[in-house]
Amino acid sequence: MADNSKTRVVVGMSGGVDSSVTALLLKEQGYDVIGIFMKNWDDTDENGVCTATEDYKDVAKVADQIGIPYYSVNFEKEYWDRVFEYFLAEYRLGRTPNPDVMCNKEIKFKAFLDYAMQLGADYVATGHYAQVETDENGVVHMLRGIDNNKDQTYFLSQLSQAQLAKTMFPLGGMEKSEVRAIAERAGLATAKKKDSTGVCFIGEKNFKEFLSNYLPAKKGNMVTEDGEIKGQHDGLMYYTIGQRQGLGIGGGGKTQEPWFVIGKDLTTNTLYVGQGFHHEKLYATHLEASEVHFTVDTPMPKEFDCTAKFRYRQADIPVHVSLSEDGTKATVTFKEPARAVTPGQAVVFYDGMECLGGGLIDRAYQDEKELQYV
């Protein structure tokens, strides 16, 4: 068996079951393990998460149980500057951002990775459900986690070769149920703790209320394509394309079907609504993306076929990708029209099990017509 005792791995510990088991497995494999809790949000704010203190206590309990040193590091400034400001800027543009993608790129695998290297780390490890494999040429490939329901490569799609080469994902080859079972067998303090949901580091608070602390909401009309006013919206930033909940308008209309958000117009502060889950305005034939990035350094061909997803836990769909000359922009054409393609979200490319990378969706089109700004 390899002697791992000289290899230092710094584990990002959140106080959840996944990162707890990550630390346990590495410790059992003989690595020199250090646990680090990242404090990325000021929870003294009256609307902030009040769970950071509890989470850190859980990290301390687990670290003591498995016998590893642990520390807390404060990345509030980095998080605010690199993730939260971006998040607000996207909402101001009427888009729906994905802060988790940015948080992984800028905090967990940049600020945290840099900090870990200062502690003499050879690798960092997290509880993400993803896998890394190095080929015979030393190129690191990121593969989906085998638990289809938990695979998190969508959120890791902006990571670089340099970041992946220094990263371990011990849970990537496991099902979530196995991870829970390991935690319970080991009697870890977090074994029965429920998974966190909600925005990266902001937790599960009322999102609408939270956002209104930072961005002024401006009410306006909810209008059909024919110009009929159906009601008032609370502020365009609170709505996303394809959304049904929270509109406060029943069936009626021509078809009695539920109403969905089909577009926003920032200039007139109008929210467009249409009836039916399969409303034609919700279907795009292609999208344009920017900030396109691939996990391997080898240049990609300018045109290629692969599969893609443009939201977490969505099944992949077959697409054709055309890259710009410099490779940072892409036109992604779907083999069949796709529903509720949302500007601000990530589009992520796959080749079988491998996550190739991705970009941020700027615009969605139905044939030649731009959608969502009806």
From Swiss-Prot:
Pfam families: tRNA_Me_trans, tRNA_Me_trans_C, tRNA_Me_trans_M. GO terms for molecular function: ATP binding; tRNA binding; tRNA-uridine 2-sulfurtransferase activity. GO terms for biological process: tRNA wobble position uridine thiolation. It comes from the Bacteria. Disulfide bonds join C103-C200. Residues 98-100 are annotated as: Interaction with target base in tRNA. The keyword Amino-acid biosynthesis does not apply. The record marks H128, Q345 as: Interaction with tRNA. It is found in: Cytoplasm. Catalyzes the 2-thiolation of uridine at the wobble position (U34) of tRNA, leading to the formation of s(2)U34. Belongs to the MnmA/TRMU family. This is tRNA-specific 2-thiouridylase MnmA. It comes from Enterococcus faecalis (strain ATCC 700802 / V583). The gene is mnmA.
